[in-house]
């Protein structure tokens, strides 16, 4: 991963409106690979439910993100429910997106490596589609 890129954890209340809009826009640009969000409010609700998230920043520009849930979040996704019926605890990768102009730069790998460390440190299996 290019050293100019920075990974930052984020949660409800730690992102500004510009970053939230960038996350939303990046999400929508990556549908159908990630589920479409109905609105910014929908994104904010996901972040409220989430347990561990990362932003990839190039200076202050959001160029990637991942949103992850724990087993107790109450998330309504059918894919998430599949894992709640099979695992007692887990870290669920709900969505990950990288800006098209920044792909093939190791960003996805860096994000997943960070998620693997978080899961290992908390003795959690990772659940994803």
Regions found by a protein language model. Give the residues of each.
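Short amphipathic alpha-helix that is part of the acyltransferase structural core
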Residues: 1-41, 57-63
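Conserved GNAT acetyl-CoA-binding A-motif
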Residues: 119-129
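Conserved acetyl-CoA-binding loop-helix of GNAT-fold acetyltransferases
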Residues: 98, 104-117
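Ordered hydrophobic segments in well-structured contexts
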Residues: 55, 65, 90-92, 125-127
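Short loop/turn motifs at secondary-structure junctions and domain boundaries
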Residues: 44-50
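Conserved beta-hairpin
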Residues: 51-66, 70
């Amino acid at each position: 991963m290019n050293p100019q890129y920075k990974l930052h954890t984020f949660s409800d209340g730690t992102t500004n409106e510009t970053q939230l809009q960038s996350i939303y826009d990046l999400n929508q640009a990556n549908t159908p690979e990630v589920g479409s969000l109905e609105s910014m409010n929908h994104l904010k609700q996901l972040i409220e439910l989430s347990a561990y998230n990362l932003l990839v920043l190039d200076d202050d520009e959001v160029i990637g993100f991942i949103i992850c849930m724990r087993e107790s979040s109450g998330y309504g996704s059918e894919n998430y429910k599949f894992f709640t019926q099979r695992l007692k605890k887990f870290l669920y990768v709900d969505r990950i997106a990288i800006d098209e102009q920044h792909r093939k730069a190791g960003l996805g790998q860096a994000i997943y490596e960070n998620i693997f460390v978080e899961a290992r440190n908390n003795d959690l299996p990772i659940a994803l589609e």
